[in-house]
């Protein structure tokens, strides 16, 4: 029975239908992978603003997505307010609540929070410290809503991690002193007389970061669900529950020691006595820094260190010849100091020494050498910029592409430039062997003896030429590899657009052969329609047209109502599929029956194409 059903299905289903279904499934999977984002991706926040006499706290309840609480919203807000921090000795001025809905948080901030809707017992309640209200502050709903939105965005930036639990403690403030004029935080160690604040810890996991610019951040540690009383501290805020209390105490002791050092340095009087050389009378300058007052005058005297003594003649003769040559190169005087219309050019010698020179871009290479180098007798100065030898002295620096701050390598030797008329490089062939050039092509022999030091230059040029030849061969191989892919891609494209109608007979034989083979393969399998009057073929084409057209209409409607789901890649794929639908499926549906004259012309053109392929 099963075999009969399978056989019937195979007889009923056509290969084109199976291929179309597979393409649809592949497109659906690709679209899901590209746009794996929910169409309605948003986050719900309930924000409560608690305004106290000298403080302002914001409670943020991150509900996630599609939150359906089992309790009423009034009960939820009551539970939030019951878990608000209570401060002894202060009066709560006002409470305002705001509902925040942020759609597509990736457009607001790159949120590391997962897209989920947590249960009621796993919801994270955040307490955020806000800037305290100023004197005579009147509660403003607009400003409170702005604070609420900022708090919600801050939660998105931090991520939704329900395992965090921390506490923040408000430092004790003391009145401003005369020398600072600003409010300072008392960073002394806790004592029995220091003020203490009681905080109520509830059974809901929450964190208490601070975005108040006027208050210092604090270190957060794990606490238990017990009411705790903590003295003021001075630490840096960080969500690191692994830190222990010992580290907190050590950091507090280090801060106290730094404060003691700062107080002792403020009360000290600095006296500097500097002596200036080259003057008859020695002047002594005494600088006193009063407490909290500005420094009136500070004199800086640069002490120049004595340069190393020059080398003796015996030591110079003992050095190797190469080191001596590098020393001579670095001893060439270079004119330093900028002037009007000149740019900075850095000269780098072979011994890794650099000197700054200033020249105009309109100066020639010869003028640059004359201005910045002396003792040119029996010396050849080679300037190299970006791997290019500045050989032509009559060209300007601007023609060689020099810019302000360019680095020019300088090589000084006694080897002259190679003459253009002398063939110094043998021809390089693919087999790697050298071949002597013919005498008819060889340049006339020069009677001038070549110095012995020119051999390394020739070897260097030969190496460079071989390297360029190898690079050219690699480029040729890469081009050959890429050119082999062109007929395949072109053949696939021509198969869809009926290559039997091609009138251009000058195409390569390989391209036509492959395209014709692909076309015949697709026609034999029923993927392309032949020019016959078979009613079944027309029925299959009509069915494929209506299926494809309905899918394109559905995707277009979805794109119109949910444009946020599509990104650039998905939209590009949609455009490609739409163009294929218009130029292939729709045009095939509207294709009229050919006339007998056109059929005869097409047969003649096909015969001409086949004969041309055979001749090629």
Curated annotation (Swiss-Prot):
Compositional bias annotation for Polar residues: 221-237
Disordered: annotated segments: 166-243, 272-298
Xref: PROSITE patterns: UBIQUITIN_2 (PS50053)
Biased composition (Acidic residues): 272-287
SMART domains: UBQ
Annotated InterPro entries: TMUB1/2, Ubiquitin-like_dom, Ubiquitin-like_domsf
Name the record gives this protein: Uncharacterized protein B0303.4
Species the sequence originates in: Caenorhabditis elegans
């Amino acid at each position: 029975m099963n075999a009969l059903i399978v056989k019937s299905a195979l007889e009923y289903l056509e290969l084109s239908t199976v291929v179309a279904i597979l393409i649809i499934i592949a497109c659906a999977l690709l679209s899901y992978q590209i746009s794996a984002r929910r169409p309605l991706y948003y986050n719900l926040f309930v924000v409560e603003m608690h305004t106290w006499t000298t403080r302002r706290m914001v409670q943020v309840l991150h509900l996630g997505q599609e939150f359906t609480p089992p309790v009423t919203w009034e009960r939820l807000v009551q539970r939030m307010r019951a878990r608000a921090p209570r401060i002894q000795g202060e009066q709560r001025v006002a409470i305002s609540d705001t509902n925040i809905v942020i759609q597509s948080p990736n457009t607001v901030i790159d949120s590391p929070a997962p897209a989920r809707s947590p249960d009621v017992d796993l919801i994270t309640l955040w307490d955020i410290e806000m800037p305290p209200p100023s004197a005579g502050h009147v509660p403003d709903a607009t400003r409170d809503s702005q604070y609420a939105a900022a708090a919600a965005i801050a939660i998105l930036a931090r991520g939704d991690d329900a395992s965090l639990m921390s506490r923040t403690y408000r430092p004790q403030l003391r009145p401003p002193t005369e020398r600072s004029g600003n409010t300072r935080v008392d960073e002394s160690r806790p004592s029995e007389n220091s003020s203490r604040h009681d905080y109520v810890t509830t059974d809901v996991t929450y964190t208490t970061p601070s975005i108040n610019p006027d208050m210092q951040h604090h270190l957060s540690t794990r606490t238990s669900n017990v009411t705790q009383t903590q003295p003021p501290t001075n630490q840096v805020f960080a969500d690191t529950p692994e830190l222990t209390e010992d580290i907190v105490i050590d950091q507090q002791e280090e801060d106290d020691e730094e404060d003691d050092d700062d107080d002792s340095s403020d009360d000290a009087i600095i006296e500097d006595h500097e002596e200036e050389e080259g003057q008859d009378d020695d002047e002594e300058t005494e600088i006193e820094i009063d407490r909290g007052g500005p420094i009136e005058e500070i004199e800086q005297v640069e002490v120049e260190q004595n340069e190393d003594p020059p080398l003796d003649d015996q030591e110079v003769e003992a050095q190797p010849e190469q080191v001596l040559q590098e020393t001579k190169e670095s001893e060439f005087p270079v004119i330093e100091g900028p002037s009007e219309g000149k740019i900075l050019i850095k000269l780098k010698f072979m011994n890794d020494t650099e000197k700054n020179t200033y020249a105009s871009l309109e100066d020639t290479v010869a003028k640059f050498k004359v201005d910045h180098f002396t003792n040119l007798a029996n010396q050849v100065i080679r300037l190299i910029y970006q791997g290019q030898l500045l050989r032509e002295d009559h060209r300007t620096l601007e023609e060689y592409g020099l810019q302000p701050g360019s680095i020019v390598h300088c090589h000084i030797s006694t080897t002259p430039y190679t003459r253009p008329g002398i063939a110094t490089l043998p021809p390089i062939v693919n087999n790697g062997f050298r071949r002597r050039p013919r005498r008819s092509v060889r340049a006339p022999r020069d009677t001038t003896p070549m110095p012995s030091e020119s051999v390394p230059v020739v070897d260097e040029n030969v190496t460079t030429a071989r390297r360029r030849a190898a690079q050219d061969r690699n480029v040729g191989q890469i081009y050959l590899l890429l050119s082999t892919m062109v007929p395949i891609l072109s053949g696939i494209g021509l198969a869809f657009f009926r290559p039997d109608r091609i009138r251009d007979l000058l195409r390569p034989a390989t391209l036509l052969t492959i395209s014709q083979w692909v076309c015949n393969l697709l026609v034999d399998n029923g993927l392309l329609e032949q020019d016959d009057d078979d009613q079944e073929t027309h029925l299959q084409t009509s069915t494929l047209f209506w299926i494809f057209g309905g899918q394109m209409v559905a995707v277009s409607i979805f794109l119109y109502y949910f444009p946020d789901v599509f990104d650039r890649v998905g939209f590009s794929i949609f455009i490609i599929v739409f163009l294929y639908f218009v130029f292939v499926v729709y045009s095939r549906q509207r294709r009229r029956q050919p006339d007998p004259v056109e059929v005869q012309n097409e047969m003649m053109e096909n015969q001409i194409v086949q004969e041309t392929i055979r001749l090629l």
